[in-house]
Amino acid sequence: MRTVSARSSVALVVIVAAVLVWTSSASVAPAPAPGSEETCGTVVGALMPCLPFVQGKEKEPSKGCCSGAKRLDGETKTGPQRVHACECIQTAMKTYSDIDGKLVSEVPKHCGIVDSKLPPIDVNMDCKTLGVLHYKGN
């Protein structure tokens, strides 16, 4: 039986938060500047409940996951924040194979976050394009 390490939990939470970078919903205080240590700390605390869903262990995100996702949705709106989040996703996806990128992309939909603006993110994406582009999903 494999236990989840703190490092893998942090990476997962960063991934889920990055997905939320492109969504629009509730307004909250702005996130710290991209690259600051506080950004990942905030994400970790809010999105830890999403881990079982994005690993495919649960069919739906928990209420705690959705609550954190909605809060973080309002904290990551600028181009630089999207670039930083995308880079975090790529790093984590290269490191942890038990995170399903498709499930990460589904968190906003499952949590009722409307007007999701999520581009397809994979390890080959040029994250810097997110500083000027704002993808509007279908």
Curated annotation (Swiss-Prot):
Transmembrane segments: none annotated. Keywords: Allergen, Disulfide bond, Lipid-binding, Signal, Transport. Pfam families: Tryp_alpha_amyl. Residues 1-36 form the signal peptide. Disulfide bonds join C40-C88, C50-C65, C66-C111, C86-C127. InterPro entries: Bifun_inhib/LTP/seed_sf (IPR036312), Bifunc_inhib/LTP/seed_store (IPR016140), Plant_nsLTP (IPR000528). GO terms for biological process: lipid transport. It comes from the Eukaryota. One of its GO terms (molecular function) is lipid binding. CDD domains: nsLTP1. Belongs to the plant LTP family. Plant non-specific lipid-transfer proteins transfer phospholipids as well as galactolipids across membranes. May play a role in wax or cutin deposition in the cell walls of expanding epidermal cells and certain secretory tissues. This is Probable non-specific lipid-transfer protein 1.
